[in-house]
Amino acid sequence: MTTLPSPLTGNPELRLSMIFTGIGDEAAGAIEGQIQATRQLNWKHLEMRGVEVPGYPKGNLHDIPDAAFDLAVRQLESAGVGVYCFGSTIMNWSRRVQDPFDATLAEVKRAIPRMVRLGAKYVRIMSFKPGDEEFRIPAEVFRRVKEVTDRFLDAGLQPVHENCMNYGGMSWQHALDLLDKCPGLKWVFDTANPIFNPDRSRPKPWPRQDPWEFWVHLRDHVVHLHIKDATWNPARNDADYNWPGEGQGRVRDVLRDALARGYDAALSIEPHMVTVFHDAQAKAANNDALMENYLQYGRRLEKMAAELRGRQQKDTGT
């Protein structure tokens, strides 16, 4: 499969090799729809999370049966679409650190050979859902995340932790603590997730996190970017999701800063505007609306990135 470039940090030279990708099940549940969206955008890679293969129920790429996985691989290869990152459910916001660790290790064991077969360099992991009143990371979380990290690294694969509804995402301080305790772990920064997550490093009542502050403290560890934008809605006590650059996620500022620092890895879209992956109450969205939203989101991000890169090249004379 395709060899993927590594992100660069601190290099002012602007490169043209940035990869645009997206979390496939935000475009369609079925593998055919995910491939269709990728090809319509003239992209070459998917970030695969949930997928439905004909004849099998939808599941995460590391959980679907071997026969379903084989079929998915054949369809991807036939279409010339690579998998940039595995959007795994390993230790995610639906799991507690009190759950049996054997189940987590079984997911890791299934994911590794599938990543290798697809040539995926990155696997997104998390660090379990904290209790409502927790503000410290338990030692057992560090132990489990380190073991999972080591298993992927030993296989030549790079785990990346996402700031989300997990212990490592409780604040940028918690994130740095997790990275310190788990050598070799890297970060995937989600621009919108700080908007709806409380900053548990501060006294109660916990304020919501600041996306820019989180980015500035974590950017040296970031090798992958999830592009999502949102605005906090006090009336709903939840986030409303927006086009990139139109919310409070500081998407334009983060992207401008990333480009200035030489970031040339992937920008992966996760619109959330039609359906929210972790919203158990969300109804099945109209397939056409889901697809059209994904395509327009991707085109808007490409336009933003091109404008920022052009302005930066003009300013630096490169």
What residue ranges belong to the model's regions?
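Active-site-proximal loop/turn and secondary-structure-junction residues that shape catalytic pockets
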Residues: 22-24, 50-52, 89-92, 127-131, ...
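Short acidic/histidine-rich active-site segments
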Residues: 266-274
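Active-site acidic/histidine proton-transfer and metal-coordination neighborhood
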Residues: 3-8, 32-39, 71, 75-78, ...
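Boundary/entry segment of secreted carbohydrate-active catalytic domains
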Residues: 4-30
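A structural motif
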Residues: 43, 48, 81, 115, ...
